[in-house]
């Protein structure tokens, strides 16, 4: 679907239909208020749908869309009652980042069951942030500064492309642009072993070698890295060496949107050794979006 054609009812119908392909019921009372709150940006937004293969995401279907840098998505979410303050440092993080860093644009993520979940903060294309600079922000998770040396050893500490703020799980993702060397099998194994994560399977190592980006998950209760995940852009996810599972494969074959647009596949290993994948397909795509610059810049 081309940009400029999104409308509230049309987007909602597409979300509901796509979730139904996975036998997930769309909770209108959760989804409609989010779309309505950002109705003005939907016609020009990148709009994506995401499914995951792990048990934690069973019964959920995630959607996300981009928001221009001139709009503060957290302020909108608060104003429209999509989220509420509880006194956690995560609630000031987006505002603190705005004060310390140049911001290009944002993304908003929600589940059709769980409602509002995340905000992404994209830094300007070609102007990566560093962990050292981000670590000066008082509301950042303590693990950011604690793991700076680890990521510096692998050439990632000054390659931060964006961050993801997860209000539902009280975690933060840091997304790095990765060179081919960083996602090679020896380096991936070394990173996992250094922080005590299980070795990926041979299948996953092959997948990782195609990645343009790496991201890590941090929280405010620990200085440890929760996980490391790898991002691959592909035209045909079924050709990847990834265990997408029958439901996700059926979704790929059945979803009527984004047939000719790129797909994103993410892979991760949990601390318990579970390997899982997330597939992201696009209802509405824009080649000039900051999102596409991330793909291009990740391997430049």
Curated annotation (Swiss-Prot):
Under the heading CDD domains, the entry gives: PT-CloQ_NphB
| Record key words, sorted | Prenyltransferase, Transferase
Reactions that this protein is recorded to catalyse: flaviolin + (2E)-geranyl diphosphate = 3-linalylflaviolin + diphosphate
User: Is ATP-binding among the key words of this record?
Assistant: no
Q: Which InterPro entries match?
A: Aro_prenylTrfase, Prenyltransferase_CloQ, PrenylTrfase-like_sf
List the GO molecular function terms.
prenyltransferase activity
**Pfam families found in the cross-reference section:** PTase_Orf2
Q: What name does UniProt use for this protein?
A: Flaviolin linalyltransferase
- Describe what happens without this gene: Mutant still produces endophenazine A, but does not produce FNQ I.
The superkingdom of the source organism is Bacteria
Claim: rRNA-binding is one of the keywords in the record: no
Q: What class of enzyme is it?
A: transferase
How would you summarize its activity regulation?
Does not require magnesium or any other divalent metal ions for activity.
- Give the family per the record: Belongs to the aromatic prenyltransferase family.
Subunit note:
Monomer.
Known EC number: 2.5.1.123
As for what it does, the entry says:
Involved in the biosynthesis of furanonaphthoquinone I (FNQ I). Catalyzes C- and O-prenylations of different phenolic substrates. With 1,3-dihydroxynaphthalene and 4-hydroxybenzoate as substrates, catalyzes O-prenylations.
């Amino acid at each position: 679907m081309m940009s400029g054609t999104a409308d509230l009812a049309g987007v909602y119908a597409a979300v509901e239909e796509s979730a139904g392909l996975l036998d997930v019921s769309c909770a209108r009372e959760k989804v409609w208020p989010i779309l309505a709150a950002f109705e003005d940006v939907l016609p020009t937004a990148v709009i994506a749908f995401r499914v995951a293969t792990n048990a934690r995401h069973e019964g959920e279907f995630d959607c996300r869309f981009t928001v221009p840098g001139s709009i503060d998505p957290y302020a909108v979410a608060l104003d429209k009652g999509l989220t509420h303050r509880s006194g956690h440092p995560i609630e000031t993080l987006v505002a603190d980042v705005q004060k310390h860093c140049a911001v290009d644009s944002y993304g908003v993520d929600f589940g059709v069951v769980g409602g509002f979940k995340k905000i992404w903060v994209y830094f300007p294309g070609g102007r990566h942030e560093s962990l050292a600079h981000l670590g000066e922000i008082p509301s950042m998770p303590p693990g950011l500064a604690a793991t700076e040396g680890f990521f510096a050893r692998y050439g990632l500490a000054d390659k931060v492309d964006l961050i993801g703020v997860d209000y539902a799980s009280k975690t933060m993702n840091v997304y790095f642009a990765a060179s081919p060397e960083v996602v090679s099998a020896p380096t991936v194994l070394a990173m996992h072993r250094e922080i005590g994560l299980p070795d990926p399977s041979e299948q996953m190592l092959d997948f990782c070698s195609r990645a343009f980006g790496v991201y890590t998950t941090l929280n405010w209760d620990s200085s440890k890295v929760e996980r490391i995940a790898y991002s691959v852009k592909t035209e045909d996810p079924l050709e990847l060496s990834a265990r997408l599972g029958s439901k996700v494969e059926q979704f790929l074959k059945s979803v009527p949107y984004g047939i000719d647009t790129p797909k994103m596949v993410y892979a991760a290993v949990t601390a318990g050794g579970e390997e899982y994948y997330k597939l992201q397909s696009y209802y509405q795509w824009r080649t000039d979006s900051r999102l596409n610059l991330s793909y291009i810049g990740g391997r430049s």
